[in-house]
């Protein structure tokens, strides 16, 4: 069966998306949500373009320690936007209501908690933290505050992903014992655009990270160096493991094992190819395969139960009944349910954030679920770097070998 939009919403009824492309109580021109953007690399500029498509907000300030990027962001925000290199100037501005944080991972905790302390609502990219301890601190502080904090795991605000959750909850898959996740990218190192060092505050870029000399590969591809990011595990697996947590109603694995190597990009610290396996409560396991060698097939998840399989990615959802699949020699069945993505999940996710700023309700990707997803990624990286399986002690909140 091919689901159209009408049958989609019928199937997904009872699950609140928490998103609206236009709000009934949208604020007027003098009552808009005034937003500053801290860290204006490519992802942050993409988020800015999404915000410009949504009603009731205004981009009023941009901050980056590298002037050329700050000026690129200012072109998006508009000529009247304030331009600063020190993020604290945005947080000190009482006329700014909220901030978008698009910095490298190692800055996420500090700027997010500074923003919350300053009374700002926050949209911070994933992973929300650079370590498990950072994430735990963020949960404690943010949940004790009155601020709205949304994290960039946009699947939680994306229509066909919400339908996927409804299918899982319906029991149509039977007993789910295996979830396969994968994400393939294509990347190269070297041939970097020259950096104008007179326009970069490298010390401020490093911030809480260890002091070290400037290297262009660390500036441009910081995700793949342990001082600043967590490689393809925290960059990519975090999205999918958040979906696993959400769909399966779990918040942490029992244990993790991982292996990886730099087969193609020797310059990086973090491996360009990784496999990880995670054992979960509720008698199921999940795997992750990630590589930066080839982008063919991109990324997605497969939930396998004894009655059926759900395959989902950012373009579509497909449910397969398993009746014929167990007969030797038969081909895989045609999908019983097929839904193609009807929109942009980042756009609806940012709308959810704006709506929650107005209503003061909990956003779809709130700090606790964001921490749980990042924590599982950090656990997988701990196993990867240790070279053996590690266990998670959920009572003591610590990793055990």
Where are each of the predicted segments found?
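N-terminal secretory signal peptides and thylakoid transit peptides that target proteins
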Residues: 1-15
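Conserved SAM-binding strand-loop segment of SAM-dependent methyltransferases
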Residues: 81-86
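Beta-strand-loop-alpha-helix segment that lines the small-molecule cofactor/substrate pocket
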Residues: 104, 109-157, 171, 387
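Contiguous beta-strand/loop segments that form the cofactor/metal-binding neighborhood of enzyme cores
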Residues: 162-163, 172-175, 180, 187-223, ...
